[in-house]
Amino acid sequence: MTNKLFFRAKDAQEHTALARSTFYSYIAKGLLPPPVKLGERASGWLVSEIIAINKARILGKTDADIKKLVIELVESRSRFEEEGRNE
């Protein structure tokens, strides 16, 4: 496991074991979550989201199931904003 919150593109690709073109194709198809904007010219993927997708693949989930999971993961990002307000 890692203590990182984000993976940059290369690390995210390595952790999914996908080629670069496949990685971005999966994002376009909704099979991987889109990146989070980290700065003006930097993006990253939440480690927890990449791990969740990998677990779903290991469990043999269908592409339809994974698309639903991606939607849930992206929607749950708004909780970070809500948690920040409560601190």
What are these regions (language model features)?
Residues 36-42:
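Short Lys/Arg-enriched helix C-cap and helix-to-coil transition segments
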Residues 1-17, 21-22, 47-87:
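Basic Lys/Arg-rich amphipathic helical interaction modules
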Residues 15, 35-36:
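Surface-exposed, Lys/Arg-rich phosphate-binding patches that contact polyanionic backbones
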Residues 28-29, 55:
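Residue-level detection of the helix-turn-helix DNA-binding "recognition helix"
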